[in-house]
Amino acid sequence: MFRNQYDTDVTTWSPTGRLFQVEYAMEAVKQGSAAIGLRSRSHVVLACVNKAQSELSSHQRKIFKVDDHIGVAIAGLTADGRVLSRYMRSESINHSFTYESPLPVGRLVVHLADKAQVCTQRSWKRPYGVGLLVGGLDESGAHLYYNCPSGNYFEYQAFAIGSRSQAAKTYLERKFESFQESSKEDLIKDAIMAIRETLQGETLKSSLCTVSVLGVDEPFHFLDQESIQKVIDTFEKVPEEEEDAGEGEAEPEAAPGAAGTGEQGGSGDQDVAPMEI
């Protein structure tokens, strides 16, 4: 049986119980630039890779403000993400106007999942080709959700979506146990380091990433480029210091005629620096 017999309509099931159009939408998420979210007890940090179509164009926005206590990062079709973020903003405003209180994050995520799920049941609609990391803060604490094109949603301590996101997930899995008690500064640093993991050797600069923060008594806002670059500089100096220390230890042991050996060792350390992952 050929797949193209069952992937022409989103409401057509394959004999193996699969909806190929929904799976294609989920694959679109993997093609987008990486987006990362982390949360502690009091803060949520969203970060993404800035991707431009060419050197002459500006990058597309991948993080949107929904309300003072909610933000969303997307991976996949940016146009779909823009439409859904506008829907989320409308839901938040309507709730605030009606009940005079902020919209709980979990309730907004359910509304968003229901909207996405309807597109998997109508033959004249297509699934949204975008994944959303929804971060927010309400009376029950900080939350981070992932909304899938299939209409499913999951809550995470930290998560990454998009292209090359597996490298970021590996980094987050190594450190996720400490995120709950982390400070805002530590969350920002871990988010940027996770972004670096997705670049696969490309030099990390503040212009390549966007970072947003929200927390207790701290409305949603974006970090400026200077603040991001300062964080990058703090952990970019660490490999250099280790390299200098290695050269200093090698010099007393080296023979007078082997002065070049220490330099070769230093360049070897540079080759295996975290930037090359």
UniProtKB/Swiss-Prot annotation:
Gene Ontology CC: cytosol; nucleus; plasmodesma; proteasome complex; proteasome core complex, alpha-subunit complex
Keyword DNA damage in annotation: no
Region annotation (Disordered) ranges: 237-277
Modified sites of kind N-acetylmethionine: M1
GO biological process terms held by the UniProt record: ubiquitin-dependent protein catabolic process
Keywords of the record: Acetylation, Cytoplasm, Isopeptide bond, Nucleus, Proteasome, Ubl conjugation
Residue(s) of cross-link: Glycyl lysine isopeptide (Lys-Gly) (interchain with G-Cter in ubiquitin): K51
Gly residues composition bias: residue spans: 259-268
Phenotype caused by lack of the gene: Do not show arsenic tolerance phenotype.
Domain of life: Eukaryota
Subcellular location: Cytoplasm; Nucleus
InterPro entries in UniProt: Ntn_hydrolases_N (IPR029055), Proteasome_alpha (IPR050115), Proteasome_alpha-type (IPR023332), Proteasome_alpha1 (IPR035144), Proteasome_asu_N (IPR000426), Proteasome_sua/b (IPR001353)
Pfam families named among the record's database cross-references: Proteasome, Proteasome_A_N
Acidic residues bias: start-end ranges: 239-252
Subunit structure: Component of the 20S core complex of the 26S proteasome. The 26S proteasome is composed of a core protease (CP), known as the 20S proteasome, capped at one or both ends by the 19S regulatory particle (RP/PA700). The 20S proteasome core is composed of 28 subunits that are arranged in four stacked rings, resulting in a barrel-shaped structure. The two end rings are each formed by seven alpha subunits, and the two central rings are each formed by seven beta subunits. The catalytic chamber with the active sites is on the inside of the barrel.
Function: The proteasome is a multicatalytic proteinase complex which is characterized by its ability to cleave peptides with Arg, Phe, Tyr, Leu, and Glu adjacent to the leaving group at neutral or slightly basic pH. The proteasome has an ATP-dependent proteolytic activity. May play a role in thiol biosynthesis and arsenic tolerance in association with PAF1/ARS5.
Family statement: Belongs to the peptidase T1A family.
This protein's name: Proteasome subunit alpha type-1-B
Lineage: Eukaryota, Viridiplantae, Streptophyta, Embryophyta, Tracheophyta
